[in-house]
Curated annotation (Swiss-Prot):
Cell compartments where the protein resides: Cell membrane
Catalytic residues in the record: D85, D324
Entry-linked InterPro entries: Aspartic_peptidase_A1, Aspartic_peptidase_AS, PEPTIDASE_A1, Peptidase_aspartic_dom_sf, SAP-like
Organism, as annotated: Saccharomyces cerevisiae (strain ATCC 204508 / S288c) (Baker's yeast)
Descriptive protein name: Aspartic proteinase yapsin-6
Lineage, top ranks: Eukaryota, Fungi, Dikarya, Ascomycota, Saccharomycotina
């Protein structure tokens, strides 16, 4: 297969990004479609593929960590395809004149490149690795934004910049414009236009908490004793402009072999999970800003479930973890990653950045995480890639940033409540039952506090982001927790751990840990490997 044919295949992908459906005033639905299926339906009548209903149906593509949504920006509208990311908060688009994309627009930098190789996933799905130079040419496929061609764009001259863990970089200024998808329109929507990009030919639609927005640097602004520029991002504007009732969304990736998943803004689909939907509080991540937490929860322990040996706990270390659909791999504390690797008699390979082991050991093994009285289990094969007779376990070691990516989330149903600062989780159901959607008006319908809701790691105010002291607080009632939350803003102004004490018998102990305060992005060489793999089914 020639490299150019792969890029042509990516071009054919875009023909299927047709937006169908209608809107409702209470919730918005984004079906998640996998890339292999898009190739198959490209020549079909789309009306036979998508079910039209009373909610917004926007095609979103799942490429193992890459979710793509079609957006129209400006007047007249310019079409872009943005990566949907639950781990960041800004909508960022690349400027049409950006040097990073413009220098490769003629394809001369990749036409003679054949730096790619075929590999395979554990399930036998073929995949392809392409050089980053070739991937950069995809700017034209994702689309760029020309602000000078939009009569409604206004630049507010507020600077932003951000560097991800793999070196991916954006820098530019914020502005406002009209954004639409199907018959949903957001007016005066704030987003960033990147004038300097490294390593990312696409834009991003971040849907995390606004506290994680790039802006001109939160810590920098506070150091200068000025209020940081924090704006209402995409989920917030959906509520502000009457599209949803609650700033919350549920994520369902569906099984590895399924055709569709979904993201529901402002609602929960009870048919997409089995068992109880349990709720956990988000952890305090940005201490210098008072009581605002980050989209991080507590993992109590990790176990391996094997049909032969049963339940085997590999670690009972508590750690803060982000459930991040924008990350393919999982990044766990080094001692936990080592314990998981050794449970398969694996040997760590620095070249593969993972544990190498005999593929026969996978079988029906599950990776199970205890989140505080309930467990979510994911098939270990989700974390495994294979080459010849060896398997690589893609559970990465980390000293500071802990994340469970989409290899784990594919087996979970997750509801992110950005107003109540809570995350609800259940085991995903793949029974293809009829939708049972319920609007989120206050708390998440059907969810109940986890047994370990009040025994969770929280951050000590005043600790630097990235490292810091955590305080294990055991609460006995919601009223106590409410008292605790009201004290956070005051406690944030001092380094006094006693400010966390509450009446009613709560207890606390302090342990030095690393937090998950930074966003980490998988390298684009692997993202492309995953991205292409679905085309080749």
């Amino acid at each position: 297969m020639q490299l150019i044919s792969i890029l042509s295949l990516l071009s054919s992908l875009m023909c299927s990004l047709t937006v169908l459906g209608s809107s409702a005033s209470s919730y918005v639905k984004f079906p998640v479609q996998k890339l292999a299926d898009i190739i198959n339906i490209c020549t079909q009548d789309v009306s036979t593929v998508f079910k039209r209903n009373e909610v917004l149906n926007t095609t979103v593509i799942n490429g193992i960590g890459v979710y793509v949504v079609k957006m129209e920006i400006g007047t007249p509208p310019q079409t872009l395809y943005l990566q949907l990311d639950t781990g960041s908060s800004d909508m960022i688009v690349n400027n049409a004149d950006i040097a990073y994309c413009k220098s490769m627009s003629d394809g001369s930098d990749y036409a003679s490149t054949d730096n790619y190789e075929l590999t395979a996933t554990f399930n036998g799905l073929p995949s392809t690795t392409i050089s980053s130079e070739a991937y950069n040419t995809l700017c034209s496929y994702w689309g760029t934004f020309d602000a000078s061609n939009s009569s409604t764009f206004e630049n507010n001259a507020t600077f932003f910049n951000n560097t991800y863990g793999d070196g991916t970089y954006y820098a530019g200024t914020y502005g406002t414009d009209v954004v639409s998808f199907e018959n949903i329109t957001l007016n005066d929507f704030t987003f960033g236009v990147s004038n300097d990009t490294i390593g990312n030919p696409s834009g991003i639609l971040g849907i995390s908490l606004p506290i994680a927005e790039f802006t001109d640097g939160i810590e920098y602004a506070l150091a200068l004793n000025r209020t940081p520029f924090i704006y209402d991002n995409f989920p917030m504007e959906l509520k502000n402009q009457g599209k949803i009732n609650k700033i919350a969304y549920s994520l369902f990736l569906n099984g590895p072999d399924a055709h569709f998943g979904s993201i529901l803004f402002g609602a929960v689909d009870k048919s997409k999970y089995t068992g109880q939907l349990y709720t956990l509080p988000m952890l305090q991540a940005f201490n210098t800003l008072g009581s605002n937490p980050g989209m991080i929860i507590t993992a109590q322990s990790v176990a391996i479930l094997d049909s032969e040996s049963g339940n085997k706990t590999v670690s009972d270390i508590q750690f803060p973890v982000m459930l991040d659909s924008g990350t393919t791999f999982s990044y766990l504390p080094t001692e936990i990653a080592e314990a998981i690797g050794k449970s398969f008699d694996g040997e760590y390979s620095s070249d593969d950045q993972g544990y190498i082991f005999d593929c026969s050991k996978v079988n029906d093994t599950l990776l199970s995480v205890d989140f505080g009285g309930f467990n979510i289990s994911a098939n270990i094969s989700n974390f495994v890639t294979s080459a010849k007779d060896r398997c690589v376990l893609n559970v990465k070691q980390s000293e500071s940033t802990y994340m469970l990516g989409d290899a784990f989330l594919v087996d979970a149903y997750v509801v992110y409540d950005l107003e109540n600062y809570e995350i609800s989780i259940a085991q995903a159901s793949f029974n293809n039952q009829e939708e049972d959607i319920e609007v989120i008006s206050d708390t998440v319908p059907g969810a109940t506090p986890a047994p370990g809701y009040f025994s969770t790691w929280v951050y000590k105010p005043g600790s630097p982001i990235g490292t810091g002291d955590f305080i294990n607080v055991s609460w006995t009632s919601y009223s106590e927790f409410s008292q605790y939350k009201s004290l956070l803003a005051t406690a944030a102004q001092s380094d006094d751990a006693s400010s966390f004490s509450s009446s009613g018998g709560s207890s606390e102990s302090t342990t030095k840990k690393q937090n998950a305060g930074y966003k980490y992005r998988s390298s684009f060489s692997f993202s492309l490997l995953s991205f292409i793999s679905y085309f080749l089914l």
